[in-house]
């Protein structure tokens, strides 16, 4: 009997302790919460300071995050969304589901940052990655790629931020000629995946000659695997920039904790994790600088970026052109 009473009392105390620990729910993309992504290290570092339970929820790829939040609306369990980018922020703001954070920081971004709702945490350039042992002379642009017999894997712009980035990359570089570029590229495309992880996995398994990824992707192979055979192909048209962001939900039940997390994201404790887990440039250079190996990455001679306020309208037109070209 005493054992039963003791056990019951212990369970009550455990329940009270659990109830007193605030939970912060963060929706993000799948690769962020993978064992090799930033999620585990970020969770450990933040929980050491917040007295809370940080729970990441993988919700597909970046563009799928916004779709899920819009579907859930005010009923969403998310306190913070991490993994949108500037191609989606205007659309996200129009939903009315996100609240200003007021976070300010001295960012090391290639562009000025004035948005007080969305907090940037990393950035990079899209690129086609290839294996130098299999492809000695990579194409130097979209037209050269389309004229080749190389096979590529790309991501769906409706669910993936890299896929959307490619869409706007082609549109920004070629304007009215974009439909022709897509028609010419259609024979090169092996498949269109829902997200980045699937596409990159296919490339590593030898199912394509090149994959849409980032100029920083070869750093993973160089630093984590001591493999210098992967490289990003410089394109004459320039490379499209991605700035990834996070924001708190207006309906969060943990507004102060959400703000604390966003503030943590611009601290060295978070930013120092990004280069060798998310394999992107951090929004703020860590105190110890970038890891050795990042200096070997290509630097685009020209960078492209559609302003957030214009990406909305341009995206719809570019998506229609893309769908038409790939359906032929």
Model-derived features: positions:
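Short alpha-helix C-terminal cap/hinge motif
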Residues: 40-56
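A bilobed periplasmic-binding-protein/Venus flytrap-type ligand-binding module shared by bacterial periplasmic
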Residues: 127-134, 171, 242-255, 273-276
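Extracytoplasmic ligand-binding site segments that recognize negatively charged/polar headgroups
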Residues: 23, 27-39, 60-64, 76-208
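Periplasmic-binding protein-like
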Residues: 111, 124, 182-186, 192-193, ...
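A ligand-binding cleft/hinge motif common to bilobed small-molecule-binding domains
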Residues: 87-91, 204, 208-229, 278
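Extracellular/periplasmic bilobal clamshell ligand-binding domains
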Residues: 291-328
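Mature extracytoplasmic/periplasmic domains
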Residues: 249-305
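Short beta-strand->loop
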Residues: 98-105, 116-120, 143, 222-240, ...
């Amino acid at each position: 009997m005493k054992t039963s009473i003791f056990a019951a009392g212990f369970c009550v105390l455990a329940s009270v302790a659990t109830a007193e620990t605030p939970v912060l729910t963060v929706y993000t993309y799948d690769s962020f919460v993978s064992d090799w992504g930033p999620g585990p290290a970020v969770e450990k570092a933040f929980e050491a300071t917040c007295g809370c339970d940080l729970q990441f929820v993988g919700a597909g790829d970046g563009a799928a995050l916004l779709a899920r939040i819009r579907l859930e609306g005010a009923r969403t369990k998310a306190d913070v969304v991490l993994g949108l980018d500037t191609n989606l922020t205007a659309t996200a703001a129009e939903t009315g589901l996100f609240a200003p954070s007021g976070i300010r920081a001295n960012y090391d971004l290639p562009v000025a940052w004035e948005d007080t709702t969305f907090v940037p945490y990393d950035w990079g350039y899209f690129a086609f990655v290839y294996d130098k042992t299999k492809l000695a002379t990579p194409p130097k642009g979209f037209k050269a790629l389309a004229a080749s017999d190389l096979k590529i894997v790309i991501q769906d712009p409706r669910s993936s931020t890299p896929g959307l980035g490619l869409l706007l990359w082609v549109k920004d570089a070629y304007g009215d000629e974009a439909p022709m570029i897509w028609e010419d590229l259609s024979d090169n495309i092996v498949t269109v995946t829902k997200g980045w992880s699937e596409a990159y996995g296919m490339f590593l398994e030898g199912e394509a000659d090149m994959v849409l990824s980032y100029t920083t992707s070869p750093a993973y192979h160089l630093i984590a695997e001591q493999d210098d055979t992967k490289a990003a192909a410089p394109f004459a048209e320039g490379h499209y920039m991605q700035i990834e962001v996070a924001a708190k939900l207006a309906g969060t039940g943990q507004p102060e904790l959400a703000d604390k997390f966003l503030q943590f994201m611009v601290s060295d404790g978070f930013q120092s994790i990004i280069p060798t887990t998310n394999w992107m440039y951090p929004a703020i250079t860590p105190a110890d600088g970038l890891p050795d190996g990042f200096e070997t990455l290509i630097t685009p001679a020209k960078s492209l970026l559609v302003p957030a306020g214009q990406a909305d309208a341009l995206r719809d037109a570019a998506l229609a052109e893309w769908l038409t070209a790939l359906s032929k």
